[in-house]
Regions:
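Composition-driven recognition of glycine/serine/threonine/acidic- and proline-rich low-complexity segments
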Residues: 1, 5-178
Length: 179
């Protein structure tokens, strides 16, 4: 319903605001995340919007909430974010993602979603704990096993989309999908 979408949007906005503050501390660049757009979608609709490979970061909720959270970032955005995290200027990121990049983006998302879970825990007055994130490069245009990306993507799910800017280096969309 519209009321449920509004509630999810409001909660997501608070959580991502906290996550943006955490990301700022990791990349030392101003991070701005806009008001979210909330919709019910499915795998086919989602993949139609992504022509290039994307990085899926899957985070399971261990306590307090049932389900998981999948963040979808563009490959180039991950390169810039991880370059900044490793002391670079973000202007000349590596041409290809390596295990070091996946480790760094998982650490960033672990800290961001950890702070987000803490905010959510305060709002709901219950303990919320997350699993360590797992990241993988997913070719959205190819045939992939939906279960490999996340076992909930084979049915309708909630998608929350934010516009995210990081300094003058990243102007992109971050997608968070919830079961």
């Amino acid at each position: 319903s519209d009321e449920e979408k509004d509630a999810i949007g409001e909660i997501s906005n608070i959580c991502m605001g906290t996550a943006a503050t955490t990301l700022y501390s990791l990349v030392n660049q101003k991070v701005v995340i806009t008001t979210p757009v909330v919709e019910i979608t499915n795998w086919d609709k989602l993949t139609a919007e992504y022509a290039k490979p994307c990085v899926f970061i899957n985070i399971l909720y261990k306590d307090g909430i049932d389900g998981n959270n999948v963040l979808i970032l563009k490959e180039d955005d991950v390169k810039v974010i991880t370059d900044l995290m490793m002391g670079g200027d973000g202007l000349n990121p590596a041409p290809e993602l390596t295990e070091l990049h996946f480790s760094a983006i998982c650490e960033a998302m672990n800290q961001m979603m950890g702070s987000s879970a803490t905010s959510l825990s305060s709002m709901l007055n219950c303990k919320i704990d997350i699993s360590p994130p797992e990241a993988e490069l997913v070719d959205m245009a190819g045939n992939i096993d939906v279960a490999k990306a996340s076992d909930f993507l084979d049915k309708d799910f909630v998608r929350v989309t934010f516009r995210m800017t990081i300094g003058d280096l990243v102007d992109s969309t971050i997608t968070v999908s919830y079961t």
